[in-house]
Amino acid sequence: MTHRKPVAGSAVFEALDGVRTIVMAANVRMPRGIARGIMRAAKDTDSVVMFEIARSESDLSGGYTGMTPGDYHDEIIAAAHDVDFDMFVVHADHISIKKGDEEELESTRKLIQAQLDAGYTSFAIDASHLFDFRGRDLREELAENIRCTTEMAHFIKDNIGGRPFGLEVEVGEIGKTDSTGRVLTSPKEATTFLTALKENDVHPNLLAIANGSAHGNTFDDDGNLIPQVSIDLPQTRAVAQAIRDAGLKVGIAQHGITGTPRETINLHFPKGEIAKGNVGTHWQNVFYETAKIYEPELYEDMWKWTIDTYAPKNVGKPEGVIFGKNCKKAFKPFKHRTFDLSRETLHAMESVAYSEALQFFRAFSSYGTATIVRNYLEGA
């Protein structure tokens, strides 16, 4: 069996340019069983797929999953080897920069170097938090985001050994709200940002924008899990059109898809304009819902730890909301147990993940994209 290596994210989006499809980027905070199920669904549907993990989840000290960049990469490679599938990307999501000072940039370089050493083939630089409200125009307001994004993009290019790589950048902080509701990225903001990056010799494949989505689960006031229907598709189309009109070949990266009805994605999402769709918390839900049945003691211990740790900071909120919003932090303290699940439990998680991934790939119109990318690479 061939040793499987991830393909470059840039090749995926170059190959699929003009194709009405969304590439699923699966963030699997507990990869065992679940990554294999997603990979198997990708192979059976001939769908290219990305596996991603964010800085907060996986850094040099393990983040809140307990996995270093190398650990996560190895888990994905193991799943690809088991399934014998080749059309996948390992993506470093949300390499967040929130201050922009030299200390933070140096720690970011060290993280990126670890991701490069591990074998990641795509990177998302997220300096969207850096916005100067005192700026006289958009260019000044975005200056720090532009500077930090440029510096990190050049660092990747200078240290990846000449290999191609995928690049995602971000403008507009996802999930941010003000007194009027969710703050949305404007078309002008997107084109100003991308044009400045182009002038700095930075050429991203993807732009993440704030378009009404939020990360994680969505709950009502009583603590019930509800669908997320807040993504502003007309605004998303307007941003995509402005990018095209500016002569830029950059797709939209849609963050925060968990909870969005798949029939809405299937029938109404502008596929191709939205080129990448992030699905993260959904796979976490698969883990917990399966563990509830197959590993009830583990589930109860993780529930209790989460409530004991976070209830004092969330006085008055239902326990279901507290758990749903914070259970991701339970992976690290329970890693020794979640990475030692029974074969029966892993089989169940894989089966559920397989079924769920089939539906996402269908809703994203991903079927057949692996062959398109494979043919592109063979002809390159």
Tell me the role of every PLM-derived stretch.
Residues 62-97:
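Glycine-rich, N-terminal phosphate-binding loop and its surrounding beta-alpha-beta segment
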Residues 21-32, 63, 91-108, 179-185, ...:
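Active-site mouth loops of central-metabolism enzymes
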Residues 126-134, 271-291:
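Glycine-rich phosphate-binding active-site loops on the catalytic face of alpha/beta enzymes
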Residues 1, 319-380:
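C-terminal extensions of enzymes
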Residues 133-145, 219-225, 287-304, 350, ...:
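C-terminal helical cap(s) of enzyme catalytic domains, especially alpha/beta-barrels
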